[in-house]
A protein has these predicted regions:
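Short hinge/loop at the helix->beta-strand junction immediately C-terminal to the helix-turn-helix recognition helix
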Residues: 12, 187-188, 206
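Long, highly charged, low-complexity internal segments
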Residues: 1-5, 40-45, 74-190, 195
Length: 236
């Protein structure tokens, strides 16, 4: 919150102690003009959001940049990161849906009754993801997630087959971010009280902040490659 306070005091973002999700007409028009100019008309989709929380107070609009044309700021690391997050989220909120193509293939084994699966996914239209993917060289990742054109009954060979043993995971421990989200969902506190509340319960010893995410568990992964089985023992 202190980083957001600095951005607000310097005039980079609007008032930050709010849980509103709505944007002003002026802000929505600024987003529309930027999106159409930089990405094209098909990337724009006007959206207006409302807060589902019963205790929400929407005297202010959502946290957003004061100038959408200002893509980045030349400040210290934490301020740059937070501004970038706010800028991208604001712009993405007024953009079209992304369109993904997902392929799931079931493969029968001629030697036994085992069924194997292969999954692939690719982006047909970036939509709002354009803001987050911009500047990332993800061509290799997209190719890795694609499947070739296949026909029913087609005979296939294999490079390798993975068999992984997994366990049902218990609920994760709270992080500061997930705890704030839970407080918001339960209607406890306000944006201006979340940070002080979390600091207070730590200072009084009610909770302890640590790096321990739980006990590591061992699992096995069996890989079949060119008729040879290899077993790896991994942890999660």
């Amino acid at each position: 919150m202190s980083v957001a306070q600095k951005l607000y005091e310097k005039g980079y973002i609007t008032y930050m102690r709010t849980d509103s999700t709505s944007l002003s007409k002026e802000a929505m028009d600024d987003c529309k003009n930027y999106i159409k100019k930089e990405y094209g008309n098909k990337f724009y989709k006007e959206r207006q959001y409302s807060n589902k929380s019963k205790n929400a107070q929407e005297a202010h609009e959502a946290i957003r940049p004061t100038n959408m044309k200002l893509h980045s700021i030349d400040k210290e690391y934490d301020q740059n990161r937070l501004y970038d997050l706010i800028w991208k989220r604001t712009l993405a909120s007024q953009m079209s849906d992304a369109q993904l193509e997902r392929t799931n293939v079931k493969i029968e084994n001629s030697n036994n009754d085992k069924i194997f699966t292969a999954n692939g996914e690719m982006i047909n239209f970036d939509g709002f993801l354009k803001v987050y993917l911009e500047g990332n060289d993800n061509e290799d990742e997209e190719k890795a997630g694609m499947l070739p054109n296949l026909k029913i009954g087609e005979h296939l060979g294999y490079n390798f087959i993975n068999a992984t043993q997994r366990f049902t995971s218990p609920p994760y421990r709270f992080t500061e971010a997930s705890l704030v989200k839970q407080l918001e969902e339960l209607g406890i506190g306000r944006p201006s009280t979340y940070a002080p509340t979390i600091s207070t319960v730590q200072r009084r010893g009610y909770v302890e902040k640590g790096q321990n995410e739980g006990l590591e568990r061992i699992y096995e992964q069996i890989i079949l490659t060119k008729g040879s089985l290899n077993t790896q023992t991994l942890t999660e």
